[in-house]
């Protein structure tokens, strides 16, 4: 159940405004729960000097950590004064993504929120290597927050994969829609939830290579397959047909366009979290889509996902 009660917010040390913290407060005010504002810091210069003893180096690191803790408390000051339950935590760690995921695990956090930046000219979001590490490896849902206010009457879009290739797609679709409905009903008033899916058409040159192949018949059959699967999915969750959308084309083109047309405030995506060679050679549809989006993004892993990062040793 998407009853997020234990939120971890990754703080951006380069910003005086923290949209991810603001979004977390928005959720907690409507749904209850608590927030941990988390900042991993590291400066290689404190590790490389030969002029300091280990004790002096440790003292300097503690000093930097204390300064950042004070700064972070100032960032959260008005929320704390308003009675919002926010824990402040700053840690020294040379791999930020590991520190964040380890904190998720040890703190039993059920939602991770992090700010992302918008490309000045393209409008799409810019994802850093840290963002991608979290999206692929974090065991709990990850909410990437854009640095903009929530659009008026913004809708919620769920991207679903309706192919019959793998059974886990159906299971993940059910999880995405179920958790989206639960979260939206908890934090929004009269949420408008749309289900969106895309299917690729047959290549134009395939008729040349296979003279007996009829692309139009194939495309029609493929669309019919998706319509049947979408009907089954929407009826499972009592979603009206007008809130379901199936379009031909590549997901990375269709889904961002649909989000723009529907003034989406957030899109919910399933992400398999592939790493290593499988990511390099097979790719990941969700990751291709993410690169073209302009709204908030909530990514959810399938049941049974195994996090490659282990909890920090005490």
UniProtKB/Swiss-Prot annotation:
PANTHER family, per the entry: UNIVERSAL STRESS PROTEIN E
Subcellular location: Cytoplasm
CDD domains: USP-E_repeat1, USP-E_repeat2
GO CC field: cytoplasm
Family stated for the protein in its record: Belongs to the universal stress protein A family.
Gene coding for it: uspE
Top-level taxon of origin: Bacteria
Function: Required for resistance to DNA-damaging agents.
UniProt KW Cytoplasm keyword: yes
Protein name (database record): Universal stress protein E
Keywords attached to this entry: Cytoplasm
Cross-referenced InterPro entries: UspA
């Amino acid at each position: 159940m998407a009853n997020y009660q234990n939120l971890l917010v990754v703080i951006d040390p380069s910003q005086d405004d923290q949209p991810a913290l603001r979004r977390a407060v928005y959720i907690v005010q409507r749904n209850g729960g608590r927030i941990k504002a988390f900042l991993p810091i590291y400066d290689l210069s404190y590790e490389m000097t030969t002029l300091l003893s280990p004790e002096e180096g440790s003292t300097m690191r503690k000093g930097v950590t204390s300064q950042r803790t004070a700064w972070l408390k100032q960032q959260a000051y008005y929320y704390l004064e308003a009675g919002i339950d926010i824990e402040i935590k700053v840690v020294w760690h040379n791999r930020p993504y590991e520190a964040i995921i380890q904190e998720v695990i040890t703190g039993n956090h059920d939602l991770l929120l992090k700010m992302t930046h918008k490309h000045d000219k393209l409008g799409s979001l810019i994802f850093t290597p840290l963002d991608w590490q979290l999206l692929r490896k974090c065991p709990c849902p990850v909410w990437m927050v854009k640095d903009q206010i929530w659009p008026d009457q913004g809708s919620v879009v769920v991207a679903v994969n309706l192919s019959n290739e793998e059974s886990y797609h159906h299971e993940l679709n059910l999880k995405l829609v179920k958790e989206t409905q639960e979260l939206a009903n908890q934090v929004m008033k009269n949420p408008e939830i749309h289900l969106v899916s895309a299917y690729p058409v047959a290549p134009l040159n395939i008729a040349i290579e296979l003279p007996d192949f009829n692309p139009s018949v194939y495309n029609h059959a493929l669309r019919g397959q998706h319509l049947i699967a979408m009907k089954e999915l929407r009826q499972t969750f009592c979603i009206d047909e007008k809130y379901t959308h199936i379009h031909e084309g590549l997901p990375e083109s269709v889904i961002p366009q649909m989000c723009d047309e529907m003034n989406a405030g957030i899109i919910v995506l399933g992400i398999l979290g592939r790493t290593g060679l499988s990511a390099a050679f097979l790719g990941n549809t969700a990751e291709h889509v993410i690169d073209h989006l302009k709204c908030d993004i909530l990514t959810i892993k399938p049941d049974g996902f195994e996090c490659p990062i282990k909890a920090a040793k005490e």
